[in-house]
Amino acid sequence: MFSKIHEECGVFGIYSSGGTDVAGLTYSALFALQHRGQESCGIAVNDDGVISGYKDLGLVGEVFPPERLQKLGGGQLAVGHVRYATTGRKSRENAQPLIINHIKGSMALAHNGNLTNAAELREALELNGAIFHTTSDTEVIAYTITNERLRTPSIEDAVSAAMDRIKGAYSLVIMSPQKLIAVRDPHGFRPLCIGRLGDGWVFASESCALDGIGAQFVRDVRPGEIVIADKGGLRSITTHCGQCPRSLCVFEYIYFARPDSVIDGSCVHTARQRAGAFLALEHPVQADVVIGVPDSGLDAALGYSKQSGIPYGVGFIKNKYIARTFIQPEQSQREKSVNIKLNTISSTIRGKRVVLIDDSIVRGTTCAHIVKLVREAGAAEVHMRVSAPPFLNPCYFGTDVDSRENLIACSHTIPEIAQIIGVDSLGYLSTDSVTKLAECGKGFCTGCFTGKYPVEVPEKKAKLRFERGLSERE
């Protein structure tokens, strides 16, 4: 049938003057970011200007047992990455960080996001002699930067020049022989923050990664900002700041980020509770208990309960060893994982009118299965409330929903969806309310709901064309 959307990637970097286990700290930080990608991961370490690394398919704990982590050795800088494939197939070659050697040195790069002009850039680079080894748009970014590096005095100048050419969503952590650099696209589609650890600096997709290694949160990287950590301290280039309206993906607050993270000044946990409160105002119902679908539906359920006065109940036990269904790359894998992911607590549900809170309905498969579990546990009624508007359009900025064909809301009305998933009523959060989730009240990308994107998007399935590379011309 239909299922849920998934996360993209998580990035991390650390700069230390020495005496710090940068590989071990990166390992710990990637554990904290594991929710952002579960297909592959990698760590690259810089030891006195020599960059080496390891990456593979699997979870952080699987790819880096103690002996593998020890082989990475010591160093002063490191970058790490957890990946879910949004552009480029699932393969070891597409795992990150990418390590690039060029005439002026070397570079390791980790990327969260998705380019909208990757196909055009790749074609131009290949015509100029570039040889690609992956089907990931991250390699396009890396080669664009190295191309600019040939005619600029520094790596940060090369990055700034590359930003004039690459379009779309990108939060980057780049490691050169002497510097660690954080980059956020001018729209700020994906989060990126700065932390302080002793006399060193760290960059991460979410603040929870800083907490996991004992680093102090300093601030978020501004949209369009380039932040450089080196022996001189921390400095930034703001040439591209303020060029575009801020457009953080609103799904970072709804689903992607961990609830204990703070993104652009707003706590994710609080934002999700606000979503639940708005839902209670927009879609009230007579019921006996409010239950959240683990994990991202739990905070919204608390908000709905507080606003409505309907008691909150724990209705599910989650198998913590099962990966998030939204992050499973294949539909068959999603369905299998749902079957063993959740179990109901029947004493909370039996004979009661249940308000079931979930973060989204994209394809519908996961939701339908969860509703079936609640029915089988003896619910008298099931009323679904969703802490996001209907998902009506593809995402071009880092989630794996590139076609309207797979979106249940595109081909069915809300009453029809309610019938398909088996609920007595169904209510979605309004687009107006979803833009008010964050306390900071800043701008969001809501293109997946409204069809209005902050930047020009490809008219065709550029992702598929990109992954085929030059084969169309052969």
Q: For the regions a protein language model found, what residue spans apply to each?
A:
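Flexible loop/turn segments at secondary-structure boundaries
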Residues: 86-87, 117, 189-190, 210-211, ...
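A conserved beta-strand->alpha-helix junction
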Residues: 134, 139-142, 312-323, 420-438
